A protein has these predicted regions:
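Short, His- and charge-rich active-site/binding loops that engage polyanionic ligands
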Residues: 75-77, 81-95
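N-terminal module-boundary/linker segments of secreted carbohydrate-active enzymes
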Residues: 15-81
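Domain-level detector of nuclease and nuclease-like folds
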Residues: 90-214, 222, 237-240
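N-terminal signal peptide c-region/cleavage motif recognized by signal peptidases
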Residues: 11-13
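Sec-dependent signal peptide recognition
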Residues: 1-7
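Short alpha-helical segments and helix-capping/turn motifs at coil-helix boundaries
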Residues: 56-64, 82-84, 106-111, 163-167
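Low-complexity, intrinsically disordered or signal/transmembrane-proximal segments
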Residues: 3, 217-219
Length: 240
């Protein structure tokens, strides 16, 4: 079930990566399981940070990675889409929190150095919206569910608590989809790490996240051009 994400991962990196071509040279010519293993070997080596400490931690990285492009002192809140002062951090829930895009409870991990502090999976978030999203999986809700508001204004997100579903606002759907796809590829159950698996059925079992079809849709803006990429990746998935 994991093979399709290799093609999707490569497609997104080929179009968006600023790394030299040599970064992925070890996987050229590979396919299927061999390709997935080659990519895993490349991305599994990275700096492990502590969740919170007096030295460089995940707070510090998010202040840079998610800085407001118009004011670097602020960070952008992922679901609200507005800036907030970065240095204040949590500040008794008056500041911001760190959202695990792949929820801890759906991955069997906490906040120990490793998967729980992988900043690829962390985003600044308002505490209330962090709690509202909870561990809901991502899907398109259309006009269903309820709108997500922040400070009296609509954010563009929606949620359905009884169904355990959350639809992010359009501007961030692609980013969140690629984070989830990265987590599926990066965490394979090696060295005591969890084996994270993407599925297309909701609430399947521990260490899984859904829905594949919605993440594909989130990743590609649905235009004439991207339609052919979407068909291509589904074709590759079937072949694998």
């Amino acid at each position: 079930m994991k093979h399709c994400f290799v093609a999707l991962f490569l497609g997104s990196t080929a179009m968006a990566s600023v790394k030299p071509l040599t970064y992925y040279q070890d996987e050229w010519g590979e396919d299927g399981d061999d390709l997935r293993e080659a990519l895993y070997d490349i991305i599994r080596v990275h700096t492990r940070l502590t969740y919170s400490s007096s030295s460089t931690d995940t707070w510090d990285v998010l202040k840079v990675s998610d800085a407001d492009p118009t004011n670097a002192t602020n960070v952008m809140l992922i679901y609200a889409g507005i800036p907030v002062n970065g240095p204040q951090e949590y500040n008794n829930n008056q500041g911001w929190t760190r959202e695990h895009v792949w929820p801890k409870s759906l991955g069997g991990f906490g906040t120990s150095a490793g998967v729980g502090t992988d900043v690829h999976n962390l985003k600044p978030c308002n505490g209330g919206l962090n709690s509202l999203r909870s561990n809901h999986e991502y899907d398109e809700l259309g006009t269903g569910g309820s709108p997500v508001n922040f400070n009296g204004s609509a954010t563009g997100s929606r949620y359905n608590g009884s169904a355990g579903l959350f639809e992010p606002r359009d501007d961030i759907k692609g980013d969140l989809a690629r984070i989830i796809l990265y987590m599926d590829l990066r965490y394979e159950g090696q060295g005591g790490e969890p084996d994270l698996i993407l599925l297309d059925s909701l609430h399947s079992f521990c260490n899984s996240f859904s829905l594949i079809s919605s993440l594909f849709y989130f990743h590609f803006p649905f235009s004439f051009f991207s339609f052919f990429f979407l068909i291509f990746f589904f074709f590759v998935f079937i072949l694998f």
